[in-house]
Amino acid sequence: MALSRLMIRDFRNISVADLSLAADFNFLVGANGSGKTSVLEAIYTLGHGRAFRSLQSGRVIRHEQPEFVLHGRIEAGNVDARATSVGLSRNRLGDSTVRIDGSDGHKVAELAQLLPMQLITPEGFTLLNGGPKYRRAFMDWGCFHNEPAFFTAWSNLRRLLKQRNAALRQVSRYQQLRVWDQELIPLANRISEWRADYSAAIAADITATCAQFLPEFRLDFSFQRGWDKESDFGELLERQFERDRALTYTASGPHKADFRIRAEGVPVEDILSRGQLKLLMCALRLAQGEFLTHRNGRRCLYLIDDFASELDTGRRRLLAERLKATHAQVFVSAVSADQIRDIPDEKGKMFKVEQGKISLQSEV
């Protein structure tokens, strides 16, 4: 699975671009602020419905333009399969249109299913040293792509938690919350089971990849479901009613889950250098993408912003070798071509990005 064509209009500093892409490596080279990260962000937005550098859609629309428009052509990877066209537009009011094979009315979740991707950026350390929400997102990405019913259950869980938290400000007795909890409890248990199963299933892939990237450390991974593992969730909600009512939110549950990583028994953020943390982050993203391939035959797109950041030559070469071994489509940004010489790829393409204009510089 790969993007064979990408069209961008009025996204960030890019007025218009129409790119024919390589199925292997695509390199984006340009000075800081040139727009190379904007290309990565356009691809990410096409697959997620949102940008990774801003949660406000208006900020990614080019100055004085009413909307951005993104189009892509997805090749399935075999000769007999039909290509899929996808599109996303959004105006300054936040109204979106998702188009698949020429028809409107689709949901962003459908784009995410068609374009599984892994993002590695200089800000991606939050996966390791940020709050639990970043590691929940890591687990939920895997559940979303491996369990068809997950997204609906997850959406319903969010809705019920929001309603329950609003009700906590108004009720005086737990019995008044039962209408929400009767639906919430089975959803919470189901989502927790999916997360636990996924975390256990991917553990071997993560361990093997981390052993290549950080052989000097013994790493341990543990899933924490968000409430006491000895407690029944329904009983816990009733027991903690007064506490939740005082807080005006639900203090325990799958929305508090975490996926903890330790090195030699110590949280990785306390013992690893920034370069080692980046390698670990890359290992996690690669392991997750490869697990998807092993499980159902689908390949991710890998988006890597500022490839050389935090990595010496040896580590860049190791990352390049592992990326090539995935046989997936990879997009890499760098300030100069020197920073990506460790990624020789005879089938790749190199694009020069300058002030929002993108041109094919060479076939690698």
Curated annotation (Swiss-Prot):
Belongs to the RecF family. PANTHER family: DNA REPLICATION AND REPAIR PROTEIN RECF. It holds the Pfam family SMC_N. It comes from the Bacteria. It comes from Sodalis glossinidius (strain morsitans). This is DNA replication and repair protein RecF. GO terms for molecular function: ATP binding; single-stranded DNA binding. GO terms for cellular component: cytoplasm. Coiled coil: none annotated.
